[in-house]
């Protein structure tokens, strides 16, 4: 199960990113983190930008409300999303 932490302005959760995947999609769950694949390579922040776009679309929030709180240059990241609750995130991840 993915660990989603409530913050004062939204939520945060761990992501394990797989750059250069065959398609941009949810791959599954790995050690409490959401495992995602993006087709972009990890060059010049392209994989990070693809991750932000994908998560924003998945959770139906603006791109500006999604930030990488930790792990800019790592496959293991912490994503922060403003303006949503943990319950909303869980619901939208189940629908996907």
From Swiss-Prot:
Domain of life, source organism: Bacteria
Pfam families: DUF167
InterPro entries: DUF167, YggU-like_sf
GO cellular component: cytoplasm
Family per similarity comment: Belongs to the UPF0235 family.
Name this polypeptide is given: UPF0235 protein Acid345_4205
